[in-house]
Amino acid sequence: MSPQADFDKAAGDVKKLKTKPTDDELKELYGLYKQSTVGDINIECPGMLDLKGKAKWDAWNLKKGLSKEDAMSAYVSKAHELIEKYGL
């Protein structure tokens, strides 16, 4: 499979996990997903009262500078780790 196909499959599989991952695991996946699909963060940091938006922004911002290909590979690895941990 191509890296893009692996990524697309992993993104679909993560939605089917039997148990919801922890918030930290979800933030890690979110940051890698956005870096894979959009690239470096391109939006303003949300206000401090938007806790969920700020957490997502921080997760994505931590991946800044990572190439889309490396982010895809890291996302697939993390997804496989979560599938092993939580099952489909």
UniProtKB/Swiss-Prot annotation:
Domain of life of the source: Eukaryota
Compartment list: Endoplasmic reticulum; Golgi apparatus
Pfam family, one: ACBP
This protein's UniProt keywords: Endoplasmic reticulum, Golgi apparatus, Lipid-binding, Transport
Sequence positions that bind an acyl-CoA: 15, 30-34, 52, 56, 75
SUPFAM superfamilies assigned: Acyl-CoA binding protein
Major location (coarse): endoplasmic reticulum
GO cellular component, one term: Golgi apparatus
Annotated ACB domain residues: 3-88
Entry's Gene Ontology molecular function annotations: fatty-acyl-CoA binding
Gene Ontology BP annotations: fatty acid metabolic process
Tissue: Brain. Is selectively expressed in glial cells.
Entries under InterPro entries matching the protein: Acyl-CoA-binding_prot_CS, Acyl-CoA-binding_protein, Acyl-CoA-binding_sf, FERM/acyl-CoA-bd_prot_sf
Cited PANTHER family: ACYL-COA-BINDING DOMAIN-CONTAINING PROTEIN 7 (PTHR23310:SF51), ACYL-COA-BINDING PROTEIN, ACBP (PTHR23310)
Free-text function comment from the UniProt entry: May play important functions in the control of brain and pituitary activities. May regulate GABA neurotransmission through a paracrine and/or autocrine mechanism. May not bind acyl-CoA esters.
Family per similarity comment: Belongs to the ACBP family.
Protein name: Acyl-CoA-binding protein homolog
Taxonomic placement: Eukaryota, Metazoa, Chordata, Craniata, Vertebrata
